[in-house]
Regions:
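Flexible, glycine/small-residue-enriched loop-and-beta-strand segment within the central core
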Residues: 41-44, 51-160, 189, 197
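A generic "structured core" feature
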Residues: 151, 169-175
């Protein structure tokens, strides 16, 4: 009996949390997790039926923008930070647990894309090699574009200036440091095409 009561209380708390965020963001969440960190000074546009997992961090600084389209999934402990750029997450996108997205230079993720657990997407970089300029003062922001229907395996890293063509697969633990202009299966460090799709 006590376990049933505890389960009911947990369900009730989750429903209250979801309804609160539905009101705050004027949308209908599928689920809004516990222990989330929400720090918003910029613009946010959210679609319907979005799943936000437990312990997700969403930071949208002033002058930045976050857009998440309908039916998308943000897994537990993901960290999404928009500072100075725009992050656009398309329809029915899945970003699995513990992934990190830095949107400094802008990130666009196309519809129906799957991002594996612990993946890293960083839309900025540091220049080096000029003795008169400190590394911390020399930042590039080219942005990242992921096309539609892409699958990034677990622990994939995507660096600034990359565009990945639609209908591509990036193998687990790969590093994408240059644009991938044609669809295919890519693996390795750096990622190289091993098969056309």
């Amino acid at each position: 009996m006590i376990f049933k009561l505890l389960k009911l209380m947990s369900w009730f708390t989750a429903q209250c949390r979801k309804q609160f965020y539905n009101l705050v963001f004027s949308t209908q969440f599928r689920y809004f997790g516990k222990g989330c960190t929400i720090d918003i000074s910029g613009q946010v546009k959210l679609g319907k039926n979005i799943y936000i997992g437990d312990h997700v961090t969403l930071i949208v600084e002033q002058g930045a923008c976050l857009e998440i389209a309908d039916d998308s999934f943000i897994g537990e402990s993901c960290y999404i930070k928009c500072f100075g750029g725009k992050i656009e997450i398309g329809r029915d996108v899945s970003i699995n647990s513990k992934s990190y997205i830095n949107g400094c230079g802008g990130v666009c993720i196309g519809d129906n894309t799957r991002i594996g657990t612990q993946s890293i997407i960083i839309a900025s970089n540091h220049k080096f090699g000029e003795p008169d300029i400190l590394v911390k003062d020399s930042i590039t922001k080219q942005g990242i574009i992921l096309g539609e229907n892409i699958w990034l395996g677990a622990r994939v890293t995507v660096l600034d200036g990359v565009k990945i063509s639609s209908n591509s697969v990036i193998g687990a633990c790969s590093l994408v440091s240059k644009p991938l202009d044609t669809s295919g299966v890519y693996v390795g460090v750096p990622a190289k095409k091993i098969r056309a799709l």
